[in-house]
């Protein structure tokens, strides 16, 4: 049985190193759609929502939640334009539905500082409003980013 299915983090099982210290990747930030199984009708019902959605206006800056190294910039189906950053200990942060990537990253810059601009929030992929979809993975297993950020639900 996979750790995520038991509600245990990979960290608790020793599969990943210590999680990076995270700051919200958009400001101001609140969670419009939490991590976990989504219920409802339609083709994406009862599927894992592998991150959190942080509403932001189109064109707002998405910034690095932790210092890291750019591992991928790609367009991927429902996620649209996304960036993956790797962090020590087997951790990855993922930023999806971007409208644009900063030119330096698109030109090959690889190291980023915490809070550094990555791109602009957009509506690429499948989305029901402008927001940043933010994921946290430990050795490839999705974790709830909200457990590492001081964020609450949008009101």
Functional labels for PLM-detected ranges:
Residues 49, 87, 97, 131-133:
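Histidine-centered active-site/metal-ligand motif
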Residues 132-140:
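A short hydrophobic beta-strand segment most commonly corresponding to one strand
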Residues 63-64, 73, 88-115, 139-141, ...:
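Short histidine-centered loop motifs in beta-beta connectors
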Residues 6-12:
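Bacterial N-terminal signal peptides
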Residues 1-5:
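Bacterial N-terminal signal peptides that target proteins for export
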Residues 14-82, 86, 114, 123, ...:
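Surface-exposed, glycine-biased beta-strand/turn segments
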């Amino acid at each position: 049985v996979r750790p995520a299915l038991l509600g245990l983090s990979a960290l608790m099982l020793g599969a990943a190193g210590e999680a990076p210290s995270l700051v919200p990747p958009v400001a101001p930030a609140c969670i419009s759609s939490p991590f976990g199984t989504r219920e409802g009708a339609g083709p994406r019902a009862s599927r894992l929502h592998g991150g959190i959605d942080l509403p932001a206006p189109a064109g707002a800056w998405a910034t690095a939640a932790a210092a890291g190294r750019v591992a991928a910039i790609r367009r991927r189906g429902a996620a649209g334009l996304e960036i993956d950053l790797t962090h020590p200990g087997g951790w990855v942060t993922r930023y999806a539905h971007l409208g644009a990537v900063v030119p330096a990253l698109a030109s090959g810059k690889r190291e980023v500082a915490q809070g550094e601009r990555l791109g602009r929030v957009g509506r690429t992929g499948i989305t029901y409003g402008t927001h940043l979809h933010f994921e946290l993975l430990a050795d490839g297993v999705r974790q709830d980013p909200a457990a590492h950020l001081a964020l609450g639900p949008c009101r």
